[in-house]
Amino acid sequence: MTNIRKTHPLMKIVNNAFIDLPAPSNISSWWNFGSLLGICLILQILTGLFLAMHYTADTTTAFSSVTHICRDVNYGWIIRYMHANGASMFFICLFMHVGRGLYYGSYTFIETWNIGVILLFATMATAFMGYVLPWGQMSFWGATVITNLLSAIPYIGTNLVEWIWGGFSVDKATLTRFFAFHFIFPFIIAALAMVHLLFLHETGSNNPTGISSDTDKIPFHPYYTIKDILGALLLILALLLLVLFTPDLLGDPDNYTPANPLNTPPHIKPEWYFLFAYAILRSIPNKLGGVLALVLSILILILTPMLHTSKQRSMMFRPFSQCLFWILVADLLTLTWIGGQPVEHPYIIIGQLASIMYFLLILVLMPMASTIENNLLKW
């Protein structure tokens, strides 16, 4: 009798994706983050669903409905903080996942990579809209400042901003539509993630060496299912430590003050995972230039396959490129720190230098290092 998991139309898809999938025998823990992102997404959809049952998307009651969730709903506080801190874990996993792709040359799977970049944009948009929903001070002013950036677009800018706002300022219409989008987007992300996996399974996974692993494959189950479960346990442990001990560590105290259009907070800043892009935006004195730099800071990832000049795929055997990669990581951490600081000396100049360094590393220095390494191979 044939095994049902190999014959049943639905089970067959699951089997070919998670059980009998041929996987390289040498993929390290850096390959865990894909499955961790899947877990984060499921967690966010579930906690978000339960929050949506008690939340009201109205400017007069949004803030108090979040308070009501935390005070009166059974385990509402843990659902709310799991959702808020789950977003942080999601972005940590995302950055690790993208970093892994850059380090080991996974961007040469162009379709998979491009869908991944679209996923990154979609996740950032979702997180931004979610941050607006509690209708605290930082929610309101963050929404005002970030949506207002679109007014820098020539000719259609002002009309576009008013169209998104649904009026002449961030108000009830804005909150309602942001809630609608925030609810639907995770399902779009889930669909895109499936396309991402579909493209990945066309080629098979990359591995740390960057060399084809067709000659040495092992089944995904039990080897990598066990490995992924370990990663998942560590992720859930980290999330629970954050939620149960320091739930407000990554939040902004200003968001515990209800939104007030007449009172601007001293430092308007987004959540920590957007600070690197926010620092790049602020480091350019011109509004349109800043917006372009902001978009390009993420969109630049699409160019990486074209900027790959090395004869080797992975950075595993390329010390110069490795060095530049870790300088890029340090640069991004610097930008994240600067994004959270006030706009004054010396933070302005540090931010500008770090922004220049960011684009210089990706567009010029890393391709140059790869070319030098190619020449060294001839010696």
UniProtKB/Swiss-Prot annotation:
Pfam families: Cytochrom_B_C, Cytochrome_B. InterPro entries: Cyt_b/b6_C (IPR005798), Cyt_b/b6_C_sf (IPR036150), Cyt_b/b6_N (IPR005797), Cytb/b6-like_sf (IPR027387), Cytochrome_b (IPR030689), Cytochrome_b_C_euk/bac (IPR048260), Cytochrome_b_N_euk/bac (IPR048259), Di-haem_cyt_TM (IPR016174). It comes from Oreotragus oreotragus (Klipspringer). Heme b b562 binds at H83, H182. The keyword Nucleotide-binding does not apply. It is found in: Mitochondrion inner membrane. Binds 2 heme b groups non-covalently. It is a multi-pass membrane protein. Keywords: Electron transport, Heme, Iron, Membrane, Metal-binding, Mitochondrion, Mitochondrion inner membrane, Respiratory chain, Transmembrane, Transmembrane helix, Transport, Ubiquinone. The cytochrome bc1 complex contains 11 subunits: 3 respiratory subunits (MT-CYB, CYC1 and UQCRFS1), 2 core proteins (UQCRC1 and UQCRC2) and 6 low-molecular weight proteins (UQCRH/QCR6, UQCRB/QCR7, UQCRQ/QCR8, UQCR10/QCR9, UQCR11/QCR10 and a cleavage product of UQCRFS1). This cytochrome bc1 complex then forms a dimer. Heme 1 (or BL or b562) is low-potential and absorbs at about 562 nm, and heme 2 (or BH or b566) is high-potential and absorbs at about 566 nm. Its main location: mitochondrion. One of its GO terms (cellular component) is mitochondrial inner membrane. SUPFAM superfamilies: a domain/subunit of cytochrome bc1 complex (Ubiquinol-cytochrome c reductase) (SSF81648), Transmembrane di-heme cytochromes (SSF81342). The chain crosses the membrane at residues 33-53, 77-98, 113-133, 178-198, 226-246, 288-308, 320-340, 347-367. A ubiquinone binds at H201. Belongs to the cytochrome b family. Coiled coil: none annotated. It comes from the Eukaryota. Component of the ubiquinol-cytochrome c reductase complex (complex III or cytochrome b-c1 complex) that is part of the mitochondrial respiratory chain. The b-c1 complex mediates electron transfer from ubiquinol to cytochrome c. Contributes to the generation of a proton gradient across the mitochondrial membrane that is then used for ATP synthesis. Heme b b566 binds at H97, H196. Its cofactor is heme b. One of its GO terms (biological process) is mitochondrial electron transport, ubiquinol to cytochrome c. This is Cytochrome b. GO terms for molecular function: metal ion binding; ubiquinol-cytochrome-c reductase activity.
